[in-house]
């Protein structure tokens, strides 16, 4: 019981910075028809209600692709696509309206009761839908008339902001009207993407059947830049995947990211609590598309001393690193390089140059326990080696008691004390007996 309580406390402590950071921000959440059909959908809705209770401004966009196809199949009506876009004739439009209307009522009801059976039971969630989007027809392409398939002409973002200011969740579907009063079938990814851009949303969030984008070995890729995401889209399309939740969301995420939306997140609709884990933990659980990485490798400043001390103290207590006082760190802070993730220092290293001997020491190498199985140490080594080359240094050495093989695997070879700069030879601790490893730059 005590262990569970400790986990709860630690989890809450780690989530508090994200609660504060997200409060008052606008998120656009895209719910594809596949996510709505899944048995975990009620949990997703409950988590959306939780986000609303934490002061996050929410616009929820829902799709209805499988529900529309099901309606068509029941009426023995074959869906028609041109260039992977549905052709919406008059009969299809009626089924689109029917599916979208039922989903709007269902999602509104679920959101309205999403805080039941929680400590916030009794809190009222106001869900608002309306004609915030004006549509226009796609027209004719290669002789094919898309009929009532449309695209966005304009968005009344001021009206949406007023609803968000009043504490409502704005719920929008795939049907919008034109200035002439006609109805058009839109794609949920276009609606979500354009809303995120026009509302200057902090995040756009989507769901797919997997936990995100995976590499060739099936591992989740936690972060993609737009160009990488575009390459992934092209790879999937070459495999014949044009309309999966992953591809549809990635297309929108690339556009949103390049248009100022800071982060777009792709999560699994099958994973219970994926939305909460992604937004309120440092490493998340899915894939995010970003213009700027959540992680930065940079030179340390005086403001980083607390984070560096917190990182290296456990290693000093274990005897792995030589102890450094706060005063010493303050004097030597310009020699340190850190890796920072969401304002947490997760790795550090220092470069001490000896210009006369054209050699440098890489020291105080530390990586947060949660990230030691990743490539952060290698990132620091490359950065420090580049700094040494820019200083005109020819060699780099390290003194280590534990990481001998790690450095040897990266080009360092064992050496004797006499290869060290004279100043360093005089300070060498023969009782500690650190191994000396040397690499050419």
UniProtKB/Swiss-Prot annotation:
Record text on subunit structure and interactions: Homohexamer.
Major localisation: cytoplasm
Start and end residues of each N-acetyltransferase domain: 295-434
Pfam families for this protein: AA_kinase, Acetyltransf_1
Name of the protein in its database record: Amino-acid acetyltransferase
Keyword Amino-acid biosynthesis on entry: yes
Family, similarity comment: Belongs to the acetyltransferase family. ArgA subfamily.
Subcellular location(s) of the protein: Cytoplasm
InterPro entries: AceGlu_kinase-like_sf, Acyl_CoA_acyltransferase, Asp/Glu/Uridylate_kinase, GNAT_dom, NAGS_kin, NH2A_AcTrfase
Enzyme Commission number(s): 2.3.1.1
Gene3D superfamilies membership: 3.40.630.30, Acetylglutamate kinase-like
One annotated Gene Ontology cellular component of this protein: cytoplasm
């Amino acid at each position: 019981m005590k262990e569970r309580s400790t986990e709860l406390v630690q989890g809450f402590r780690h989530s508090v910075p994200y609660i504060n950071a997200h409060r008052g921000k606008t998120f656009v959440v895209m719910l594809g028809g596949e996510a709505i059909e899944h048995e975990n959908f009620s949990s997703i809705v409950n988590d959306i209600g939780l986000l609303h209770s934490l002061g996050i401004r929410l616009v929820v966009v829902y799709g209805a692709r499988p529900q529309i196809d099901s309606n068509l199949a029941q009426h023995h009506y074959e869906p028609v696509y041109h260039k992977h876009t549905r052709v919406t004739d008059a009969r299809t439009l009626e089924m689109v309206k029917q599916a979208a209307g039922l989903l709007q009522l269902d999602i509104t009801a679920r959101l309205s009761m999403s805080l039941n059976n929680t400590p916030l039971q009794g809190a009222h969630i106001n869900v608002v839908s309306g004609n915030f989007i004006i549509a226009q027809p796609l027209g004719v392409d290669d002789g094919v008339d898309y009929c009532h398939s449309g695209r966005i002409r304009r968005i009344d973002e001021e009206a949406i902001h007023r609803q968000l200011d009043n504490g409502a969740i704005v719920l929008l579907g795939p049907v919008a009207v034109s200035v002439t009063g006609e109805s058009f079938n839109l794609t949920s990814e276009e609606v979500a993407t354009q809303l995120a851009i026009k509302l200057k949303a902090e995040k756009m969030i989507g769901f797919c059947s997997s936990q995100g984008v995976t590499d060739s070995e099936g591992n989740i890729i936690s972060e993609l830049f737009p160009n990488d995401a575009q390459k992934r889209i092209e790879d999937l399309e070459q495999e014949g995947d044009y309309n999966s939740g992953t591809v549809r969301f990635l297309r929108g995420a690339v556009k949103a990211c390049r248009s100022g939306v800071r982060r777009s997140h792709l999560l699994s609709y099958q994973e219970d609590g994926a939305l909460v884990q992604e937004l309120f933990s440092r490493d998340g659980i899915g894939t995010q598309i970003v213009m700027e990485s959540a992680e930065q490798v940079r030179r340390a400043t005086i403001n980083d001393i607390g984070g560096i001390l917190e990182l290296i103290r456990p290693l000093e207590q274990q005897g792995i690193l030589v102890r450094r006082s706060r005063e010493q760190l303050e004097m030597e802070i310009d020699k340190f390089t850190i890796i920072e993730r969401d304002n947490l220092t997760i790795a550090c290293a220092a470069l001490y140059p000896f210009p006369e001997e054209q050699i440098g020491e890489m020291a105080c190498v530390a990586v947060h326990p949660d990230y030691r199985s990743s490539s952060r140490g290698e990132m620091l080594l490359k950065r420090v080696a580049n700094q040494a080359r820019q200083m005109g240094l020819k060699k780099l050495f390290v003194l280590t008691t534990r990481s001998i093989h790690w450095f040897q695997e990266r080009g360092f070879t064992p050496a004797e004390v006499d290869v060290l700069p004279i100043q360093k030879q005089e300070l060498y601790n023969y009782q500690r007996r650190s191994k000396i490893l040397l690499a050419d730059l």
